[in-house]
Amino acid sequence: MYLKSLTLKGFKSFASPTTLRFEPGITAVVGPNGSGKSNVVDALAWVMGEQGAKTLRGSKMEDVIFAGTLSRAPLGRAEVTLIIDNSDNVLPIEYSEVSITRRMFRDGASEYEINGSSCRLMDVQELLSDSGIGREMHVIVGQGKLDQILQSRPEDRRTFIEEAAGILKYRRRKEKALRKLDAMSANLARLTDLTTELRRQLKPLSRQAEVARRAATIQADLRDARLRLAADDLVSRQGQRDAIVEAETMMRRDHDEAAARLAVASEELAAHEAALTELSGRAESVQQIWFGLSTLVERVSATIRIAGERAYHLDVDPATPSDTDPDVLEAEAQQMEVAEQQLLAELAVARTQLEAARAELADRERHAVEADKAHLEAVRAEADRREGLALLAGQVETMRARIESIDDSVARLSERIEEVTARTQQILAEFETVQGRVGELDQSEVHLDEQHERAVAALRFANERVAELQSAERDAERQVVSLRARIDALTMGLERKDGAAWLARNYSDTGLLGSIAKLVKVRPGYEAALAAVLGPAADALAVDSLGAARSALTALKEADAGRATLVLADWLADAGPACVTGLPDGAQRALDLIEAPPWLQGALIAMLYGVVVVNYLAEALGVVDICPQLRVVTVDGDLVGAGWVSGGSGRRLSTLEVTSEIDKAGAELAAAEAHMAQLNAALSGALSEQVAHSDATEQALVALNESDTAILSMYDQLGRLGQEVRAAEAEWESLLAQREELEARRVSILEEVVELETRLHNVEQIQHVHALDENSAAARQLIVAAAEEARGVEVEALLAVRTAEERVNAVCGRANSLRRAAAAEREVRLRDQQAHAARIRAAAVAAAVTDCGQLLASRLTQAVDLAARHRDALATERQQRSVAIAAVRYEVNTLRVRLATLTDSLHRDEVANVQAALRIEQLEQLVLEQFGIAPVDLIAEYGPQVALLPTELEMAEFQQARERGEQVTSPAPMPYDRATQERRAKRAERELAELGRVNPLALEEFAALEERYNFLSTQLEDVKGARKDLLDVVAEVDARILQVFSDAFVDVEREFRGVFTSLFPGGEGRLRLTDPDDMLTTGIEVEARPSGKKVSRLSLLSGGEKSLIAVAMLVAIFKARPSPFYIMDEVEAALDDVNLCRLIGVFEQLRGQSQLIIITHQKPTMEVADTLYGVTMQGDGITAVISQRMRGQQVESLVTSSS
């Protein structure tokens, strides 16, 4: 690895794009002072991640951008690109050439790229850290760096060795773990405080919960007794509804039968066919298609469940229509019409008879009056004459006026009677119209109830499906996380620290073929057995030849990197049988249990020749007795041979076993991830169905509420019309009584008028009565008797007329009412027929939906399986090939079906039996308000027919008696007894009062608090376990740092002695730890004593000597932990020619293993350079560069020309 080129654009004085191409060896950069030589060093440090502006000889980072000159405008950005030759794979990246670019803008924004791809600063630093280039940039020795090394604190000198040894990444890992520990400490303290507080609260709350539990038991007993008493009261008032309850029971039985048929039909569901089309070869597209198909499967399943629910409702028979026959009503209407005509005819005859009777009465009364008054006229004529004509005439006029007033009142009453009659008929017609509308709304209400129940059932199924899928998804996610954690833990276990690991990381010979654990495949279950037989070879590396093995072992020895086991791939061996006959059942050859590449078969035969695998140790001993030359191993890893046995517990898992476990966990992880993706797809479809069903339920509920409001309004209107009818009938009866009273008064006044007119006529005739004729008196008696008889006939005729009028009024309009009732009944029957036909059609459609849904679900399931197989195949091939796969795209014509479900029996019974419900409404309302339970449920659960089951106390006493051996019978249910239930209720009330105040929320609070305490306790244990794991990680990292630093310090100190001797012949120098007991934080002191000098402090040495000592320390680090390249900026400026020659000798030593880039003014340094770069700056302030491959004889001419 070496620096290949450096390109600068707008960096400091390099305004124009400038590329410096480097080669292995020593590259010298020369030029006058201020020409920009050190800017090359700054550019190298900057592009490799330097973040300190002062290190780059600036005050702020923006100073690296070209600031402009008098003739050149400033630039907006600086860009440096470094190309590194990585043909030896020192950098952990699969490229032979690595390009690192850093770009900075005037606004402070920075960009980093590796091989043209954007990355982070951390990525650049981690990439370079593995080659010994860290944050401190010890490979770049700039101006002032030598003084900094000697003047720095011992702890700061330590960082140079740590960076060269690659310890900084371990320190970063340790710092990360410590930060997690700090964050975890606060959580641990918080969890401890919470669990302590919760534990303190649990004890008093448990006592309250026990009291609440006892109170709940007593309250339940009291409620049960009260409910039984209320049920007894309600049953006693529901005698008239027994038939309805019986019908409801029958319909519930039909409902259960329909549900059973639905369950049987649900098992026969399949899916509709779907068409398969070609998919693209991309795994991402296959995944999307699989996800869509899984979503469709979930949606089709939800549709099938909804269709099944609707089919269940279609199996229930509707309510029996009314028994009223419209033809009978029509016949009754015709009979009423005939009766009305007959009554009208009778009324006409009665009126004719009344007129005739009145005429006869008037004639006879006239004769009677004439006869009677003829007798009196003579007697009273004299007296009347005295009274005066004026008085009689006034009385007559007064009477006539009263008669006229009565006639007017009678006429007005007759008109009002007719108006009231007409209004009554109109209200009755409106009443019947509203009643018909109520029937229509009831039918619509039934449909809306069915629709709402369907929506609610579908939503319930959707909610259950979503909850089920969410639970399954959480379980699958936990399984995936667990498997990933297991794979990570096993992978960490594969990080070996032996010679094999060193070879895998650092040895670049092509003869290395890989780890045996990754090249072979063992039959599952036999990993421990094969690992025990192979021994160290289970963790070995495969090489292609004996020569490659020799080279690898030589590299291990030179690097002192530990030991490694190598398996030769070119080994040839014969797999001849070794006593393979007579083996017991279950014994197998080890070679039959392992699969390997053909070129590795020879080595495996050599290692496993004569090895047999059995299940148990006893079998192994038996096989060795039969064939002593065999080696026998059990599946648990116990080895048996002739005269020896090896086994036991506590064996460390081999790489072969760990690799097998990783493969097994990987397969389980792939299956779990596929299952989780399938659950995600199903959950997406289920959530869509849930939202759709929720919206449908809301819409159905709104429509049902609107219908209920309309029905209540109609019932209010019916009540108002009924009140108006009753008020009109009362008014009609009152007006009729007033008219009859006025007519009677008119008859009485008319008789008085006739009498007064007769007296007035007699006075005017002025006749005197001298004698009374006895014969005329007798005739007068006969005439008066005839008049009385005629008056009786007239009264009977008048009564007959009034009776006929009342009968006519009673039947008037009854025929029309019956006809309207017949029409309404026909309309109801027509709607029932239409509903029945609709149910038949809906049943047929439901069957079609079920069949199509089953076929569609089957085809969709096949399509999902096919897509999953394609997806798994693509995942296995790891995108190595792109193939055309067949996928399924299906189209389904959505079936829109209007399904009519069964009418709810309870609702129909309530509507059909309104009058019966009104009689018990008060008691039902009382039960609902006090207990919150429906009357039907109350009777079914607490009615007199329900026996009282034994209490928990009675059963406990029975069990205790049986345990004591007593002869007791099991408590039997007790029949209902009202007196017993009343005593039971009073006893419960008394016990509840004795308990005193009860906290009703204690049970829930205690359960919630206990659950939280258990959860927090579990979390606390998890946090403690995680803290222990982190402490183990810190301890492991400290051990690693201690080992690496100790080895590195020993190597650096050794190299420092040699380099110091080279630079200071006869002198003595060494590196010393300030605190050897604390290798993690100890500093490094530099002790130097040049020849002939005895100094105790480095500050007493000359500037050249201090520079050489600093260079000696850096070179010692370079030799102990070599880096691919080093950059030195005028490190020999303070040296004389002798010391310069010595330093150049050290450079010559470093040239063999690393690339050197030196900024220098010294001619001897230029003479040893393989490549020479000349840097110059003209008056424009812009640096220019020229290069030349140099040898010693060309240096003088180039230096002269460049000056």
Curated annotation (Swiss-Prot):
Keywords: ATP-binding, Coiled coil, Cytoplasm, DNA-binding, Nucleotide-binding
SMART domains the UniProt entry points to: SMC_hinge
GO molecular function terms attached to this record: ATP binding; ATP hydrolysis activity; DNA binding
GO terms for biological process, alphabetical: chromosome condensation; chromosome segregation; DNA replication; sister chromatid cohesion
CC annotations in GO: chromosome; cytoplasm
Residues that coordinate or bind ATP: 32-39
Segments traversing the membrane: none
Protein name per UniProt: Chromosome partition protein Smc
